[in-house]
């Protein structure tokens, strides 16, 4: 229905893709399932697939992400960002998990 309302379907259509993301968040059974739902809907699959994975990972927690999603990385992350020297995916995940407590101490 959202594509009918806005009359366009394609890459980088924020209303449509936000609607698809809401659809994913509503029906995902776990992180991997949600990534598959999001990417299967088409459009900007890499960006919104990553967004869905991030949001669902925060919601479900690490226990709901199957090893098959992490194994290809060999605990190594590469980034084109200047001055970003973190290479361990697991260390980066731990640091990101600590952020809410640093921003709002009562969440720790």
What are these regions (language model features)?
Residues 42-60:
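Conserved phosphate/anionic-ligand binding catalytic regions in large, soluble enzymes, centered on
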Residues 32-35, 49, 65-67:
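Acidic/polar loop patches that form or flank catalytic/metal-binding clefts of enzymes
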Residues 1-42:
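Accessory "access/gating" subregions that flank catalytic or transport cores
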Residues 23-27, 55-60, 98:
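Short glycine/serine- and small hydrophobic-enriched flexible loop segments
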Residues 14, 18, 31, 45-48, ...:
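Generic structural signal for well-ordered, non-membrane alpha-helical segments
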Residues 1-11, 59-108:
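Acidic, carboxylate-rich catalytic segments that either coordinate divalent cations
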């Amino acid at each position: 229905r959202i594509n009918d309302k806005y009359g366009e379907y394609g890459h980088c259509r924020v209303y449509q893709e936000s609607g698809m993301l809401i659809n994913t968040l509503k029906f995902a059974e776990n992180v991997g399932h949600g990534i598959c739902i999001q990417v299967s809907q088409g459009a900007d699959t890499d960006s919104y697939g990553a967004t869905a994975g991030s949001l669902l990972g925060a919601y479900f927690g690490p226990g709901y992400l199957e090893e098959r999603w992490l194994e290809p990385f060999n605990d190594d992350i590469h980034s084109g960002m200047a001055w970003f020297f973190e290479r361990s995916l697991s260390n980066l995940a731990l640091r990101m998990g600590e952020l809410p407590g640093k921003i709002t101490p009562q969440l720790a």
